């Protein structure tokens, strides 16, 4: 996949902190999530209580990290940021937990990747605001209970199915983020252009939005590249011609597909007669890992209606045939 279209963070996402919304009012899209979060925040503030623990689930690039920072901002408290993979030992987690002040937000990205020992230490911390740590080794080792300040855990995950039931059940607020509409992405792009001090035409913003795979991170990334083209051609505003020139350089078509996306669909059509084809067989034909294919490449193709999963395997849809200008087979069930 093109580095410009991956929803994961890349080096092309540096220097965009100033584009992030600082409050729920500035945050575009995810209306249901915002309503639930706004209610919980307002109630906690009115009662003078610590906010319930929050789980933010959804595909990468949809604003989970931004929402975590907004939660801390709305509560006017400190945020401590870490991620599941870096918390290797219980001591790593204990050091963070004992440094928290009342009402602080602890944000753990990729919380589904916590190892079991660290996760188990977290249970008593988020439920009773206490932790038990072992002092010493061998027969003389003893457990000491330490009280910690009440805090709010905000966990983010792209794979909520990998969360253990005991951990998931300890979150009082579970929010599922979904892909954005073209209309919402257009507003995000126009806001970003304004903050970058660049004028953009409405049609140009919509053109970028349609190629952004329902993901704000991609929309911002593409907008930055379009701004580069604007600078090079010495124009005074972003119009559709400038967007098209940029997308041609990036090899991104009008449906937001890049070269490898098209290769996936063409492989199924040309080698497997449109499918069905099993994940492992398709991955072998493409020379990629099966997990990479299912977790990185497939979500957008499924969401956009180019690919479908059946009990027998993957099939391409009529939309894919038409987009790639293949003749649609007769008597084919899609």
Swiss-Prot record:
Keyword DNA damage attributed: yes
Residues covered by region (Large ATPase domain (RuvB-L)): 1-181
Biological process (GO), any one: DNA recombination
Residues annotated for DNA binding in this entry: 309, 314
Enzyme Commission designation: 3.6.4.-
Binding site for ATP: 26-28, 62-63, 127-129, 170, 216
Primary location: cytoplasm
Catalysed reaction, written as an equation: ATP + H2O = ADP + phosphate + H(+)
Family: Belongs to the RuvB family.
Protein name, per record: Holliday junction branch migration complex subunit RuvB
The organism of origin for this protein: Thermotoga maritima (strain ATCC 43589 / DSM 3109 / JCM 10099 / NBRC 100826 / MSB8)
């Amino acid at each position: 996949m093109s580095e410009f279209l991956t929803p994961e963070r890349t080096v092309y996402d540096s220097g965009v902190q100033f584009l992030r919304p600082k409050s729920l009012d500035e945050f575009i899209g995810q209306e249901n999530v915002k309503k639930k979060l706004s209610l919980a925040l307002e109630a906690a503030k009115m009662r003078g209580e610590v906010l319930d623990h929050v789980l933010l689930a959804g595909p990468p690039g949809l604003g989970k990290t931004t929402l975590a920072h907004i939660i801390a901002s709305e509560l006017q408290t400190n945020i401590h940021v870490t991620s599941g993979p870096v918390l290797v030992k219980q001591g790593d987690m204990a050091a963070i937990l004992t440094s928290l002040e009342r009402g602080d937000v602890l944000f753990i990205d990729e919380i589904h990747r916590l190892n079991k020992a660290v996760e188990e230490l977290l249970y008593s911390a988020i439920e009773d605001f206490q932790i038990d740590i072992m002092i010493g080794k061998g027969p003389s080792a003893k457990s000491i209970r330490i009280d910690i300040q009440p805090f709010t855990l905000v966990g983010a995950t792209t794979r909520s199915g990998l969360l253990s039931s005991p951990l998931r059940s300890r979150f009082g607020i579970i929010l599922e983020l979904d892909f954005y509409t073209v209309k919402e992405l257009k507003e995000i792009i126009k806001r970003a252009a304004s903050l970058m001090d660049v004028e953009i035409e409405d049609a140009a913003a919509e053109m970028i939005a349609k190629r952004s795979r329902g993901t704000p991170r991609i929309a911002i990334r593409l907008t930055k590249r379009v701004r580069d083209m604007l600078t090079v051609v010495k124009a005074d505003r972003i119009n559709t011609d400038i967007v098209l020139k940029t997308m041609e350089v990036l090899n991104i078509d009008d449906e937001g597909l890049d070269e490898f996306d098209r290769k996936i669909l063409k492989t199924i059509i040309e080698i497997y007669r449109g499918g069905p084809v099993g994940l492992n067989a398709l991955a072998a034909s493409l020379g990629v890992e099966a997990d990479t294919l299912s977790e990185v490449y497939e979500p957008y193709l499924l969401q956009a209606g180019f690919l479908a999963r059946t009990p027998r395997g993957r099939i391409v849809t009529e939309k894919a045939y038409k987009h790639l200008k293949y003749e649609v087979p007769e008597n084919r069930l899609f």
